[in-house]
Amino acid sequence: MKFHRLTAAVLAGSMLALPAAAETRVTYKSAKSASSYYQMGVQIAEAMQEASDGEISVTVEESQGSVQNVMEVRARGGDYVFTTPPVLVSLAQGGKAMFEGKGDPAFDDIRALFPIPSLTMHFVMSEESGATTLADLEGKTILLGKGSFGATEGEKYLDLFGLADKVEIADVELSNAVPAMQNGQIDGFVTAGSWPAPNVVEAAASTGVTVLSMSDEQIAETGRTKLVIPAGTYAGQDEDIVTTSLPVAAYTTTKMDDETAYQLTKTYWESKAKLGESSAWWNGVDEGLMENITGQIHPGAVRYYEEAGIALTDAQK
């Protein structure tokens, strides 16, 4: 398992209330180390370091994906921050889908902090495969990865589009997607990293790929939101890529104290503009994404949103 340790500073609360600042350690559970979401975690930690004076230490921790992140709530304490689509929190709390038979009271204690860039589905095919549409996946060997939301979503799409029995699924980790494509072990891979996704950037630059677009009808079948990745985002992509997206947020649980939740949320929003200067995926994050958080927000984060004048729904408070 990989860890990226960064000291992230978060401004202390009132000096009258806290006469001596004590270090608070926070674990930020993200995704696979080659993914955009792992890089986001590192960037968030760096931003907090720059904005503060070392009172919170953030350890960015690699993960197999969003499902694992939610499941670990059962064994984690008040220092646990993790990322996942809001829909997975709802499924966990309802004991549905991949959480059926795995319900736990700890899931009811999950609380949101702030939204981060949305998941973006990428169907990435090697140029040698000749695939230019989803229908062309028939007879191809595809890597979906294991345990991640992208893998689950990819399986869903293959089933929806009548391809489940027409493709071969490679038993390869997503972190090995690019070398597997280079040596001809796979024809393509599916990843749900926010654009520009690092593994897609690498594949496009090193082997030549086609990132497949979806039709409006296919997007409607998925029930997800339409998203357009601009032409030129990836090497060799001369046209816009039309695909789907799903909101993602950073979460903790009621075990986290209000002050820590407040400072994490405050520093995140105050650092977001600078984050966007170095990575394009942050530019799509604004207050409008708050409406995608369908569950409760941590009281400490609620305090920040109320101070900042950001409207919350009754269900979020």
Task: Please provide the spans of the model-predicted regions.
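Sec/Tat signal peptide C-region and signal peptidase I cleavage site
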Residues: L16-A22
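N-terminal (or domain-start) structured segment
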Residues: E23-L91
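Acidic, polar ligand-binding/catalytic clefts
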Residues: Y80-P117
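Pocket-lining segment of extracytoplasmic ligand-binding domains
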Residues: P85-P86, G94-A97, K102-G103, D165-K255
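Bilobed "Venus flytrap"/periplasmic-binding protein-like clamshell domains
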Residues: R25-A51, I56, P115-N183, E287, ...
